[in-house]
Amino acid sequence: MFYYIYELLNFNIFQYITVRAGFSFFIAFCLTVYLMPKFIAWAKAKNAAQPIYELAPQTHQKKAKTPTMGGLVFIGAAVFATLLCARLDNVFVVASLLCLVGFSALGFKDDLNKILGGKNHDGLSPRAKLAVQVLIGLVVSSLLYFHGELGSKFYLPFYKFALLDLGVFAIVFWTIVIVAASNAVNLTDGLDGLASVPAIFSLLTLGVFAYICGHAVFSTYLLLPKIVGVGETVIIAAALIGSLMGFLWFNCHPAEVFMGDSGSLSVGAYIGLMGVMTKNEILLIIIGFVFVMETLSVILQVGSFKIFKKRIFLMAPIHHHFEIKGWVENKIIVRFWLIAILANLIALTALKIR
């Protein structure tokens, strides 16, 4: 809406992406901070609490009555801010909104099933959840491939030339990236604030890349792929950062609310989508290193047990391993945040080292 105010009234300030990104950040933050206490009160009244996994560390049992599905509030706030501040005739914005809303709706259904069933395993089956994730990923990826300026070239970090052209197979590759990122953040969301802050850092880094790739002068100077229109996604990233910060106000230890799958699946999917839209699919390994670390711990744990009948970790994902070893929750969370900061600083060096 703000961009169209500029077009109608020639109010120049709203033509700038950075200005509209600033507005989207504050709108999403303020809306989340305003609505979240109301949602928490409603969720408590309806007993919409997070079922705790039976095998989770004993310290988690005290969280049994904590409301969940907070993701509905902050994703809703981010979408609202985007509708106000971004250009809705931009294919990257449309794809982003489809991604956020689609994955959040899937997460809501999963959360609702768990609440109604009363147990953590009463959610959607892994196959059903994966099938819907893949379907949404394919729709979003196809939209970008057939209607966007993204192209299908594949880039490696720290290398300025495209490695190869994936052609139509880019749709499959992008879908894998989006779904993998969605599930990685979902696995990480096991401690108060553990997923939120690394997600904020990831979105900040990807927002920088999106702004530069969408800028004709900066992208040429820094030898990044020039992608017309992708700079508009900075507004969505800013909205999501703002809403996540608003959510963190209530989710920091001890949490008053959990994001649930309604939030984690959507946030992860959008991080993956931003990696796709900025041609940083492989750099996502560094940008989202905490999420990768958590996911690999699960893969290694399951693989080791199936093949060798032995467990590598006391429990997976790896944050549970440290809990069982006796680390207090805050120590695990802050140390993982520090890892996320360092990883994203390393990722940002790809702007100059090419």
Swiss-Prot record:
First-level EC class: transferase
One GO term (biological process): peptidoglycan biosynthetic process
Organism lineage string: Bacteria, Pseudomonadati, Campylobacterota, Epsilonproteobacteria, Campylobacterales
Compartments where found: Cell inner membrane
Record membrane topology: Multi-pass membrane protein
Keyword Membrane in record: yes
Catalytic function, reaction form: UDP-N-acetyl-alpha-D-muramoyl-L-alanyl-gamma-D-glutamyl-meso-2,6-diaminopimeloyl-D-alanyl-D-alanine + di-trans,octa-cis-undecaprenyl phosphate = di-trans,octa-cis-undecaprenyl diphospho-N-acetyl-alpha-D-muramoyl-L-alanyl-D-glutamyl-meso-2,6-diaminopimeloyl-D-alanyl-D-alanine + UMP
Pfam families linked to this entry: Glycos_transf_4, MraY_sig1
HAMAP family given in the database record: MraY
Protein's UniProt name: Phospho-N-acetylmuramoyl-pentapeptide-transferase
